[in-house]
């Protein structure tokens, strides 16, 4: 079965085609980062308008690269939420319209389920059960995954998501949007230990996170520190170390609490190399396994949507009616139906 996947939940336009026999055939991504850089963040109106401009050319490019025609597509999957409603509507309406025109079924896919299952596209995918750490610009969650579609929320951020904290701290340091990757880059030149940042909510029990206070701590530190490049690198290093330490402590607790022996990292922040290296070392020292997707499948993309759509089509477990275009800007992951596979 070949499924066309469409992703437009925020500011990246993604189109991909997944074949359940031959794997990922094509993965087209267009980033709007340059458009939003002047505003220091995503402007929803600009995002949706640019999705409209790019989505059809990307679909054409995907079909061309895969050497397929519309008649070769067996289903269309699109991101229905969570996300920006104006952006979601672009992908949803185009996806449903194509499915209607091509006389194939369409399916609404949960954006975070896409991220969570993106490592399944790798040569060595994880087996169940596992603990998933979902870290992105909008989410920071720990989830117990016992099978496809069966998710239990263990903990989440009570305020800012980790990716949001990265971007806001980067902005305080004068870095361009999106600042998270740039902060990580200058952190590599930072001197460890020059600044000591707190590890929020690690001294109390539980698996919830809080990053708003860490961002405030960074702001106060920046305000009283020198403004030279080395000082900024040292602050970036202290911030990143604090974030990574916090995530590691919570992941260890989640693994201990569930008794699972596998950790999956997903979402845009999971591409952070410092996080990957330190989490990998920690998990392997425990005698356990860690999994994550290649960097281009960590950020928003159509490949993860096409894959989840393929799995749900095959199981005949659909999360919504096929007769209407429905988007859900807020959509708890736990509401999804278990996939029988």
Swiss-Prot record:
It is an enzyme of class 2 (transferase). The keyword DNA-binding does not apply. It catalyses: L-threonylcarbamoyladenylate + adenosine(37) in tRNA = N(6)-L-threonylcarbamoyladenosine(37) in tRNA + AMP + H(+). Coiled coil: none annotated. InterPro entries: ATPase_NBD, Gcp-like_dom, KAE1/TsaD, Peptidase_M22_CS, TsaD. Required for the formation of a threonylcarbamoyl group on adenosine at position 37 (t(6)A37) in tRNAs that read codons beginning with adenine. Is involved in the transfer of the threonylcarbamoyl moiety of threonylcarbamoyl-AMP (TC-AMP) to the N6 group of A37, together with TsaE and TsaB. TsaD likely plays a direct catalytic role in this reaction. This is tRNA N6-adenosine threonylcarbamoyltransferase. The gene is tsaD.
